[in-house]
A protein has these predicted regions:
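Nucleic-acid endonuclease domains
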Residues: 1-53, 57-156
Length: 156
């Protein structure tokens, strides 16, 4: 098997998260019209669900701050969709209460923090313990294992 680059792993992880969310929605709400964006660089959404813009982020939590995080250039997209889902991939080294959960976030309500990584990178964090971050689905062991194949977590 060919070794994937960091970018390829991130892409595969994102695709796995989108499939998990699609399957979850189909199970929990049969009959939804789900249309995936054809353009992988779509700056507005990952998919439309019954005409609503949906973004999916697939990542391990920043365990020491109990938050999900992304670069500041993603904030506009994460705030402008109708629904944001975060697929929480277990951290390679540290257990966390969010491991294996899919969270539904209310874009206009979730609070954020800013921080700088030990590598000097500015990041936006979404604290997990707030009313606008709602656990909606516990992934199966198979789904978690698929995500873990592509996990690329830096020490956080």
């Amino acid at each position: 098997m060919t070794m994937l680059t960091r970018e390829e792993k991130m892409n595969e992880l994102g695709l796995a998260g989108e499939k998990i969310v699609t399957n979850m929605l189909n199970r929990l709400q049969p009959g939804l019209m789900i249309e995936h964006s054809i353009n992988k660089y779509d700056s507005e959404k990952d998919m439309l669900v019954d005409g609503k813009k949906v973004e999916v982020k697939t990542e391990s939590p920043y365990v020491f701050k109990n938050c999900f995080s992304f670069r500041p250039n993603q904030l506009r997209k994460c705030r402008s969709v109708d629904v944001l889902y975060i697929v929480s991939v277990p951290h390679i080294k540290f257990k966390h209460f969010s491991d294996g959960w899919v969270y539904r976030l209310i874009p206009e309500e979730y609070k954020t923090i800013e921080y700088v990584t030990k590598f000097g990178v500015r990041m936006i964090g979404i604290p997990i313990k707030q009313d606008a971050v709602i656990p909606v689905y516990k992934m199966s062991e198979e789904e978690i294992a698929e995500c873990m194949k592509y996990s690329n977590t830096e020490y956080k």
